[in-house]
């Protein structure tokens, strides 16, 4: 279901293998008695979506060569821009020959192809690969799969964004930094209003505000404000039934009363309806609260120094409602999968699973995240690690494309490297841990894409619903008009979506 909260998930991914024995040192396909015992070289075709910067220019990259040598394979990666990935994949599928390995980010595409029988069932072999098996919980392996079958390796996902506040503004206004035990939604509003009305930047102008957002269907910008009012993150479970946020009349009215007041009083950015990028306003020193991840907070703090020396965003727990309800929108591990084509024979399948098992092991993580010593990083004269000139020229993070864009394990150190500043790395990991302390999950993640009505009508229904939400916040409609939007959503297909989602939930709770 289209969640009103767009969790950016930034993120995150990788795939790996080790020997079926699962030891750290034996993740190799080579025999122990010379070349005569060495298994034949196997070609592995992998098709992966690429993001900003694209994939590596060819398959001669040092990490691919390392994998080829270690596992006696010929790894051929086809990088496809994310915007065109499924168009190209469907063309290839129509030809009857899928790549050996793919990453499927679309749950609906995954379910469709599972039903058509185009993927390998990995469950019979999984217990032989302990590193691989350990990257997800049993329910995450089972997600979106038929009972007693596993057609995809689940991608680990975790919350990364949290609420941040301008501490220097708090200090100037004499407001203490709120603690997790005391930070309420009312306190959030009072602080945000002070940022709007008390000239926290001291420039004598009425040009600051409490928080911002995007006036699109997701209302992206401050997702931690939904949970205090009891709104679901898409769907919630109640009394054995899944309920979508679109039918939560009382909760919507409480939330919209809060938001429309914030808009009227200038606490919410007046430009939120037309915003396309509120991040710029953080760096311009106009916003008191922000929703972002640690890495971006540090970049923003650096940018702020040019206009406000000493300015600093610091992390907070999400605010809680009157009943103690609070939450950080949390993605569900397993909705994205790495899959093997059904046409992969047993020998190639086992080699791929050996590779993946090593990939998510500590040894594999070291290579796939940090790169290769003396190529991507080296020790300096003081014994500390630093990037090589080659990696600096290529760009930090380019060495870890397989780790971030294919598959990774469930460690929260995926954005730190051997050469990262130790304090920065520790704070980064702690921030991700903090984001996971207040899980706020979508209860329908395993079932929503089983609804044909949702697949056909869900996006249009939600866009119409959220148009009313935005109009109410902006003062163009009264809060009570949300009931008409709920009625329209239900009668135009929402009731059928609820029925279909709950049928799937009842069949496989």
Where are these regions (language model features)?
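Bacterial N-terminal signal peptides
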Residues: 4-14
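Loop/turn elements at helix/coil->beta-strand transitions in domains of secreted/extracellular proteins
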Residues: 40-44, 71-75, 96-100, 146-151, ...
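Conserved N-terminal structural module of periplasmic/extracytoplasmic solute-binding proteins
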Residues: 12, 18-185, 233-235, 239, ...
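Helix-loop-helix "hinge/cap" segment bordering the ligand-binding cleft or interdomain interface
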Residues: 147-218, 235-281, 340-351, 357-358, ...
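Extracytoplasmic/periplasmic substrate-binding proteins
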Residues: 50-57, 171-179, 215-268, 296-332
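Glycine-rich, aromatic-lined ligand/substrate-binding cores of catalytic
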Residues: 261-264, 279-312, 318-400
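Short helices/loops that flank or line small-molecule/ion binding pockets
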Residues: 86-98, 189-195, 277-287
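Conserved small-residue motifs centered on glycine
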Residues: 354-471, 476
């Amino acid at each position: 279901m289209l969640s009103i909260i767009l969790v950016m998930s930034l993120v995150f991914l990788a795939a790996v293998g080790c020997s079926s024995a699962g030891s750290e040192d034996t993740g190799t396909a080579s025999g122990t008695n010379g070349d005569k015992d060495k298994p034949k070289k196997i070609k592995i075709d992998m098709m992966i979506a690429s993001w900003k910067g694209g994939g590596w220019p060819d398959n001669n990259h040092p990490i691919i060569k390392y994998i080829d040598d270690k596992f006696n394979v010929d790894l051929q990666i086809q990088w496809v821009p994310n915007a065109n990935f499924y168009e190209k994949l469907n063309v290839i599928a129509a030809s009857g020959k899928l790549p050996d390995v793919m990453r499927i980010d679309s749950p609906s595409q995954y379910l469709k192809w599972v039903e058509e029988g185009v993927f390998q069932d990995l469950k019979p072999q999984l217990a032989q690969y302990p590193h691989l098996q350990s990257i997800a919980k049993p329910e995450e392996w089972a997600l979106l799969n038929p009972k007693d079958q596993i057609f995809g390796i689940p991608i680990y996902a975790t919350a990364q964004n949290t609420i941040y506040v301008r501490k220097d503004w708090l200090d100037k206004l004499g407001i203490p930094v709120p603690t997790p035990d005391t930070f309420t939604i009312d306190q959030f509003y009072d602080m945000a209003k002070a940022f709007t009305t008390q000239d926290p930047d001291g420039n004598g102008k009425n040009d600051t505000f409490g928080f911002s957002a995007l006036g699109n269907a997701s209302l992206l910008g401050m997702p931690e404000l939904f949970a205090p009012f009891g709104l679901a993150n898409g769907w919630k479970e109640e009394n054995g039934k899944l309920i979508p946020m679109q039918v939560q009349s009382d909760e919507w009215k409480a939330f919209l009363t809060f938001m429309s007041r914030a808009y009227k009083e200038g606490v919410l950015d007046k430009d939120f309806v037309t915003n396309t990028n509120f991040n710029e306003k953080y760096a311009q020193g106009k916003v008191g609260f922000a929703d972002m991840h640690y890495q971006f907070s540090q970049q923003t703090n650096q940018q702020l120094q040019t206009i406000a020396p000493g300015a600093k965003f610091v992390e907070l727990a999400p605010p809680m409602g009157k009943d103690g309800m609070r939450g950080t929108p949390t993605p569900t591990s397993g909705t994205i999968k790495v899959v093997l084509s059904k046409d992969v024979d047993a020998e190639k399948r086992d080699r791929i699973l050996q590779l993946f098992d090593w990939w998510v092991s500590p040894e594999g993580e070291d290579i796939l995240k940090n790169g290769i010593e003396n190529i991507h990083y080296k020790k300096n004269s003081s014994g500390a690690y630093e990037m090589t000139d080659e990696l600096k020229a290529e760009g930090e993070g380019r060495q870890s494309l397989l780790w971030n864009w294919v598959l990774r394990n469930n460690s929260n150190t995926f954005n730190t490297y051997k050469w990262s500043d130790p304090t920065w790395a520790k704070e980064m990991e702690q921030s991700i841990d903090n984001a996971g302390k207040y899980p706020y999950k979508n209860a329908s993640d395993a079932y929503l894409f089983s609804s044909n009505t949702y697949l056909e009508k869900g996006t249009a229904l939600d866009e119409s619903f959220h148009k009313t939400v935005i109009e109410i916040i902006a003062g163009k409609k009264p809060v009570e008009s949300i009931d008409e939007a709920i009625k329209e959503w239900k009668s135009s297909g929402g009731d059928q979506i609820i029925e279909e989602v709950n049928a799937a939930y009842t069949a496989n709770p």
